[in-house]
Amino acid sequence: MKVIIPVAGLGTRMLPATKAIPKEMLTIADKPLIQYIVNECVAAGIKEIVFVTHSSKNAIENHFDTSFELETMLEKRVKRQLLDEVRSIVPNDVTLMHVRQGQAKGLGHAVLCGKAVVGKEPFAVVLPDVILADFTANPKTENLAAMIKRFSETQCSQIMVAPVPQEDVSNYGIVDCATDNIRAGETAKIAKMVEKPSIENAPSNLAIVGRYVFSATIWDLLERTPVGVGDEIQLTDAIDMLIEKETVEAFHMTGRAFDCGDKLGYMEAFVEYSLRHEKCGQQFQKIIKELAKSL
């Protein structure tokens, strides 16, 4: 199965940091955000990754490309560990492809841009703003990996969800399921989706996390999706049409997620991952403990 990762967005929520740097290249500890996303996909067994990109995002392509000059320098200076880290950014059996989204016409349009590469077959979509903590769930067997497994067993499209505080439902796409009592790793049939409902009208507190596995049926629906909110082609509109044609399931996320397209979420992720850094984690813990004394 291939995965589409839309990276054409301008990252306005993270300005001024993203004025000259793609938001996906902002670092968490010592890796850019997009590296965590690719690692998740690879751990889930995906071998073909399609970036839907923009002319300002060359740094992403460069990050995953071979840097002969850098590798030669590290080899000459006998920095073997760093050389191995650079060379292992993308496993040899994983193929990365890049497709341009010429105009910013929304997430639905971005996904549709990947059709020529993916072909008329099932595929996954992973939004790069959201990192799933690999220290709270096993990416080889849970979350995206489990969604792909569930799809292969049932042929039902999967949408990852997680509970959010009731007062925050208006910030998210919310799913209406036959039951609200699904636990981590479980699924439930979706009756409908509501984009950023009011607190009073929210059918549940299960918010879409940014991981999808779609049947090939979604392609024709995306092509027929009219321009919606913000003069954009909305992925949620296509999913609503998909729900009318076939079973679509909500898959309950396991563990924690960080919204790194939001400044506070990004800061939280940075601290959490830095505390667990293999080399610097213990020293960083001491720094945080000292800082905490003055709060």
Swiss-Prot record:
<keyword id="KW-0808">Transferase</keyword>
<dbReference type="GO" id="GO:0006011">
    <property type="term" value="P:UDP-alpha-D-glucose metabolic process"/>
</dbReference>
<keyword id="KW-0548">Nucleotidyltransferase</keyword>
<comment type="similarity">
    <text>Belongs to the UDPGP type 2 family.</text>
</comment>
<protein>
    <recommendedName>
        <fullName>UTP--glucose-1-phosphate uridylyltransferase</fullName>
        <ecNumber>2.7.7.9</ecNumber>
    </recommendedName>
</protein>
<dbReference type="Pfam" id="PF00483">
    <property type="entry name" value="NTP_transferase"/>
</dbReference>
<comment type="function">
    <text>May play a role in stationary phase survival.</text>
</comment>
<dbReference type="GO" id="GO:0009058">
    <property type="term" value="P:biosynthetic process"/>
</dbReference>
<dbReference type="GO" id="GO:0003983">
    <property type="term" value="F:UTP:glucose-1-phosphate uridylyltransferase activity"/>
</dbReference>
<dbReference type="InterPro" id="IPR005771">
    <property type="entry name" value="GalU_uridylyltTrfase_bac/arc"/>
</dbReference>
<dbReference type="InterPro" id="IPR029044">
    <property type="entry name" value="Nucleotide-diphossugar_trans"/>
</dbReference>
<dbReference type="InterPro" id="IPR005835">
    <property type="entry name" value="NTP_transferase_dom"/>
</dbReference>
